[in-house]
Amino acid sequence: GAVMAHELNKKGKKCLVIDRREHIAGNIYCEDVEGIHVHKYGAHIFHTSNKNVWEYMNQFAEFNNYINSPIAIYKDELYNLPFNMNTFSKMWGIRTPQEAKDIIAKQVAETKITEPANLEEQALSLAGKDVYEKLVKGYTEKQWGRDCRDLPAFIIKRLPFRFSYDNNYFNYQLGALEYRSVRFET
């Protein structure tokens, strides 16, 4: 909405942007608190593989180089996310993608789940018991406040799962953490 309104306004059109929230700009909205620009919904991680989009956005904001590479903790052990070869190497002491695929395939086959009915079954049928127990179950139940067996299966399909040693959460060529924010004016 904001981009469309901006572009139409540049062409002399008047625009009315309506948002269901009490403000415009969606999740990149910032509040001015005593002269400090506060990101209401958290830091803005911008990522794209489209160079034109990257150049367009750089007209409005300053970005710091940033790679999102989260870490999960399970029983005092650190695991890289998204699930990748660093994760599997730490978990199973292996080195190659084929070794990881073989372990996952064996664990998935052991579940005998053909039509997952909930998130737990979906995760087990995709990643096997070890990944589910160590890296999915606790986090998911904390995030949603519900048992994984009470959550729909589709939720787990959006987790990145890779067989490389790349710890970058996003598969985009261009990514950054917003340094100086876009200002939206009404």
Task: Annotate each predicted stretch with a short phrase.
Residues 1-2:
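N-terminal Rossmann-fold NAD(P) dinucleotide-binding loop
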Residues 77-79, 86-186:
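Active-site/ligand-binding neighborhood in enzyme catalytic cores
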